[in-house]
């Protein structure tokens, strides 16, 4: 009997589990799901570097760990520097780094520790050309320290320091395009991914493993706690982020762009479908929604042009 295509696609997700149950993540945590997929893709022969963030708590305090892999806790700003040093040290000792039979060095940092505090170290890691993978799990705020805004927080969002209410003190800046900054370094491989599309994420992790030099993946990872969303809606929200083109899926490989949307010819859904499931957007006015929708569609058209010209 021939295996259906949908089943074949599911079989691309490895069965091996290297992220143990009983960790301290909140229910519906997108970051913990993403980390589980990383360890499925790369296995135990992996060194995971985690700065100060939610994942530090989720992984567990020394000497305990929810990861069946090597774990290195580091300071907030230093993920890019530490994975650079580990990679260089392994090579100095004669170990093979990256590739299917090499040791995988992975930086796993949130948007605050990447887009803000860790941007300089990330830039240096890419510029020096280290054989490692940097993954920014993007939950769009400093969730571990109390839901403060980051430069990856979207326009119109409530956080504890953009509180909305009668004075309407919402986030009024659009989300920083971190992946564009990374691509400006002419990195060999960069991609966006989402926990709602695990097969696509696994494929990109495997590609990052094979391509020499630095790789970067920006992973959309909902936080029900910070987004004021039901814990059973994380995957639906992540899927709508893609379907509305708020967070489009694409790859940049050696100067070429490729869009990976599930239905690339389908028009994006209205941004309201993404917003309405999250309490963090409840203070937005009609004008706010229109401003965000305009930005999303402009960015989507820009990405399509890049893929057309540099595809």
From Swiss-Prot:
UniProt entry tagged with the keyword Methyltransferase: no
Catalytic activity: 3-methyl-2-oxobutanoate + 2 oxidized [2Fe-2S]-[ferredoxin] + CoA = 2-methylpropanoyl-CoA + 2 reduced [2Fe-2S]-[ferredoxin] + CO2 + H(+)
Pfam family, one: TPP_enzyme_C
Keyword list, A-Z: Oxidoreductase
One GO biological process term: organic acid metabolic process
EC number from the UniProt entry: 1.2.7.7
Subunit structure: Heterotetramer of one alpha, one beta, one delta and one gamma chain.
Listed PANTHER family: PYRUVATE SYNTHASE SUBUNIT PORB (PTHR42897:SF2)
Protein name, UniProt field: Ketoisovalerate oxidoreductase subunit VorB
Natural source organism: Pyrococcus horikoshii (strain ATCC 700860 / DSM 12428 / JCM 9974 / NBRC 100139 / OT-3)
Phylogenetic classification of the source organism: Archaea, Methanobacteriati, Methanobacteriota, Thermococci, Thermococcales
Primary gene name: vorB
